[in-house]
From Swiss-Prot:
GO molecular function, one term: valine-tRNA ligase activity
Species, as recorded: Legionella pneumophila (strain Lens)
Keywords: Aminoacyl-tRNA synthetase, ATP-binding, Coiled coil, Cytoplasm, Ligase, Nucleotide-binding, Protein biosynthesis
Parts forming coiled coils: 849-921
Entry's Gene Ontology cellular component terms: cytosol
Protein name listed in UniProt: Valine--tRNA ligase
Motif ('HIGH' region): 40-50
Length: 921
């Protein structure tokens, strides 16, 4: 083995070998296990959330594969309607070509061309993270087979009356010219204004003051609402008010929707341009006056003066006109949530349009029942409340999008506006007996991307055909996804799965938290805190990282802020940590919380863990050979240390299985880390040395220790493999010659099982006592600054016959690992020189201090340390007592300063205790 572990030297070659040998394909006849990869956008590149979830899915896949289950991790990508269309449009614009200059067919040819050339970035990146998906089964949501499934579902739902065309309010993106889903609308707080407008009461001197953040929508107002219990306005309910700037009157209505305490207590109701107002309008049978075109300009339903104006220019003009007519009472600054299109960044308009809808209530009822009955289980279970909350209040699903890229809606229209739905124009003509002389035109719209995604678990397995894969792997075992798409994707898969297969799509749903930065902030391009998983794997220089984080940013101020923050956080850029360290970090963070704070310091810690494992393997391989181990019938004897580590191994194996079954990857990672680092490396490898280095030791005992070293290493590699596939495969390939298992890959070997024969509580208790004794003696050395190499005498007081026997049994180990030259037992009243003492149960361990340390030199060193700490404490206290600092500094900076002070005070207390001990010598 090389002296140091270099991930870059092994990872790509190992993955290539795994993939080319088809190790990822289902094999055997064991229990079926199947995971569906949530299909990433074909335009996308791997982000931290992908890396996190893919690691968890891969860990589960590798675990079940090693259990002997017939395992399938089904990969594929999503056509990502809007995202892909925008990417290709921008590419064409760079060449001076507008989409509108092309026919639909020409544009779609360009999209398919782009998909073939550039659409596989994310799948290549998945390979770098070790994803063991069955690439031979890779699917795409626009594949021929998946498109056939989409058509069948649409046609069947339409024929059953569950798909219809209707006029409703949708999120409209004026820049993209399409309806968008709630998930594609980002609402963040922005600075705006609240305009207070006077609405004069008809035939009265009174007026109502209405506060609004969107005065341009006043043109579509259909009522002013007040709370029914608001005594200020009760006398006006049912009266009419003049609509400012418009030649019409509107009623005053009473509705519980109004918040009496907000603004003036009066609310303008615009049913065609606000989702809440739309509901109020339905309750009061108000008209719906749409005042906007699909491009976001004022239409012909508004007064002539404003027609054709952009909505925001109209806003400015309306404010001026209101002022001129004395109808603007006041304007005040106001913070508000502004809905913007995720892709376009323009303000989204609620707009009345004709769209296609799925009637969801009949589909939702069995989907709710499936979770209530426990057929589908959410992990953590608290997420089922979110699921029920959404499903109980479900509204019809708008499934049409005004795009060219996507599954085109299989509906045709004749010249009279009649709608015909079928698999093709010929199918429609045949079914409805329409001859060729009647022209038919296909609907221009495409289906919402989530429509095809909702069929993913069964369409990828060959549905509507009854394929062997569908029979074997559906329902799938578990879905791993984020809480943000429980409704948009998870719920819809459950509804569609039950409707079209009669079965649930998956048995369990493991909901992960969302990856945030180390301060707990959401990762976003505008914040400049985004990390690319592959930059952590391969490393990146500072200048390249800054260039990556600031590309395509319009504002210089934002670019400068991000540059400054990046230089501060990563002055040397990011080191190359390798895939395994990153994957182990992801698993260690997979707790049950909503948010996951990602800290690069943890990756560094787990890179050290990789090094520790590598060095442990080198030690084992340097101290073993085939003859010395002899897994055949050669005589061997296990030492107490061997028995201890074998017993501890069974405990670890048991916990690991439990944590895999309960999806506690954080506890799983911690259990393996503790066992490998602390029990195997720190203790067992040290405990093996006195035996292997003792010329007097029995050859059978040495053989037993070597056998244990290699066996436990083999089990560790297998236990770790689902989390850290590369380093474990590389080391395992070097150990197979020493074991009876000469497999071709660790991923196809058998996952460790508990061996009851090795469980030995009494030996664990003895070794725990021995470790405590050694640790106590090492602590004395450290606290008293005694050289680790210096042999020292040990005195023991209050010894019992049982403990004396135990010490005799472990004397060689105790002396070797504690650097003790002689053990002396004291009579009850026997005096010893001034000593450092450790208490271990009933006994006292004493180390005489005479001649072991230079008292004056040590006191001088301690005084210097204390002076430095006093200075640090004074500095921190000064800051924290200064109102200029505590009032203005961010909370996290103040918290860091408090932590710094607490650490310094703790260190000072320890040094003072040590100084007192030295002075007493």
């Amino acid at each position: 083995m090389d002296k140091t572990y270099s991930p870059e030297a092994i990872e790509k070659a190992l993955y290539k070998k795994w993939e080319s040998h088809h190790y990822f394909q289902p094999r055997g006849e064991g229990k079926r296990f199947c995971i569906m990869l949530p299909p990433p956008n074909v335009t996308g590149s791997l982000h931290m959330g992908h890396g996190f979830q893919h690691t968890i899915m891969d860990a589960l896949t590798r675990y079940h594969r090693m259990l002997g289950d017939k395992t399938l991790w089904q990969p594929g990508t999503d056509h990502a309607g809007i995202s892909t269309q925008l990417v290709v449009e921008r590419q064409l614009e760079a060449q001076g070509v507008s989409r509108k200059e092309l026919t639909r067919e020409q544009f779609l040819d360009k999209v398919w061309q782009w998909k073939e050339e550039s659409g596989n970035t994310i799948t290549q990146q998945m390979r770098r993270l070790g994803a063991s998906v069955d690439w031979s089964r890779e699917r795409f949501t626009m594949d021929e087979g998946l498109s056939a499934a989409v058509q069948k579902v649409f046609v069947q739902l339409y024929e059953e009356g569950l798909i219809y065309r209707g006029t409703r309010l949708v999120n409209w993106d004026p820049k993209l010219g399409t309806a968008v889903s709630d998930l594609e609308v980002l609402s963040e707080e922005e600075d705006g204004f609240l305009w207070h407008i006077r609405y004069p009461v008809v035939d009265s001197e009174e007026f109502l003051i209405v506060a609004t953040t969107r005065p341009e929508t006043l043109l579509g107002d259909c009522a002013v609402a007040v709370h029914p219990d608001d005594s200020r306005f009760r006398h006006l309910i049912g009266k009419q008010v003049h609509l400012p700037l418009c030649d019409r009157t509107i009623p005053v209505i009473a509705d519980d929707y109004v918040d009496k305490e907000f603004g003036s207590g009066c609310v303008k109701i615009t049913p065609a341009h606000d989702f809440n107002d739309h509901e109020v309008g339905k309750r009061h049978q108000l008209p719906q006056i749409n005042i906007l075109t699909k491009k976001g300009t004022i239409n012909k339903n508004a007064p002539l003066k404003y027609q054709g104006m952009d909505r925001f220019l109209a806003r400015e003009q309306i404010i001026k006109d209101l002022e001129q007519e004395g109808l603007l009472a006041k304007t005040e600054p106001h913070k508000l949530k502004v809905p913007r299109g995720e892709k376009s960044n323009v303000i989204i308009e609620p707009l009345l349009t004709d769209q296609w809808y799925v009637k969801t209530k009949p589909l939702a009822e069995p989907a709710i029942a499936a979770v209530k009955k426990g057929d589908i289980r959410f992990i953590p279970e608290t997420w089922d409340k979110t699921y029920f909350q959404w499903m109980d209040n479900i509204e019809d699903w708008c499934i049409s999008r005004q795009l060219w890229w996507g599954h085109r809606i299989p509906a045709w229209y004749d010249n009279h506006g009649n709608i015909y739905v079928g698999y093709s124009e010929n199918d429609v003509r045949f079914k409805h007996k329409i001859d060729q002389s009647t022209p038919l035109k296909q609907d221009e719209d495409v289906l919402d991307t989530w429509f095809s995604s909702a069929l993913w678990p069964f369409s990828t397995l060959g549905w509507p055909e009854r394929t062997p894969e569908l029979e074997q792997f559906y329902p799938t075992s578990v879905l791993v996804t984020g809480f943000d798409i429980i409704f948009f994707w998870v719920a819809r898969m459950i509804m569609m799965g039950l409707k079209f297969t009669g079965k649930i799509p998956f048995k369990e749903v493991f909901i992960t938290g969302l990856i945030r930065d180390s301060e707990g902030h959401k990762m976003s391009k505008s914040k400049g805190n985004v990390l690319d998983p592959l930059d952590i794997v391969d490393g990146i220089e500072l200048d390249s990282l800054i260039a990556k984080r600031t590309s395509n940013l319009m504002l210089n101020s934002v670019r400068d802020r991000i540059t400054k923050a990046t230089r501060k956080e990563f002055p040397e850029g990011i080191s190359a940590y390798g895939t395994d360290a990153l994957r182990f970090t992801y698993c260690s963070l997979a707790s049950t919380g909503r948010n996951v704070r990602f800290d690069l310091g943890r990756v560094e810690g787990y890179r050290n863990f990789c090094n520790k494992l590598w060095n442990a393997a080198r030690y084992v391989l340097l101290n073993t050979d085939e003859e010395q181990i002899d897994f055949g019938d050669g005589a061997f004897q296990y030492s107490p240390a061997d028995q201890w580590i074998l017993s501890r191994l069974q405990n670890t194996v048991s916990k690991v299985h439990h944590y895999f079954e309960t999806y506690r990857f954080d506890l799983l990672a911690n259990t393996l880390y503790e066992f490998v680092w602390h029990e195997y490396c720190d203790w067992y490898l040290e405990l093996s040395k006195p035996i292997l280095q003792d010329d007097q030791a029995l050859s059978a005992m040495k053989r037993g220790t070597r056998r244990t070293l290699i066996h436990v290493l083999d089990q560790i590699l297998k236990l770790l493999h689902p989390l850290m596939p590369f380093i474990t495969e590389e080391i395992w390939q070097k150990t197979t010659k020493f074991t009876s298992e000469n497999g071709i890959s660790i991923m196809l070997s058998t996952y460790p099982k508990v061996n009851e024969e090795f469980i030995n509580p009494s030996i664990e208790e003895e070794l725990d006592w021995l470790k405590s004794a050694i640790q106590s003696l090492r602590t004395i050395r450290s606290e008293m600054s005694i050289s680790p190499a210096k042999l020292i005498p040990l005195y023991i007081r209050n010894i019992t016959p049982e403990l004396k026997e135990r010490i005799a049994k472990y004397e060689k180990i105790l002396k070797t690992l504690s650097k003790i030259d002689k053990i002396n037992y004291l009579a009850p009243d026997e005096k010893v020189p001034v000593s450092a003492t450790a208490v271990l149960g009933e006994i006292e361990l004493l180390i005489p201090m005479a001649d072991l340390i230079d008292k004056e030199a040590e006191l001088s060193r301690l005084n210097k340390e204390l002076a430095k700490l006093n200075k640090d404490i004074e500095l921190a206290q000064g800051k924290l007592n200064n109102p200029k600092f505590t009032d203005k500094a961010p909370e996290e900076i103040i918290a860091k300063e408090k932590d710094k002070l607490a650490q310094a005070q703790l260190a000072k207390d320890k040094l003072l205790q040590h100084k007192n001990r030295i002075e007493s010598l």
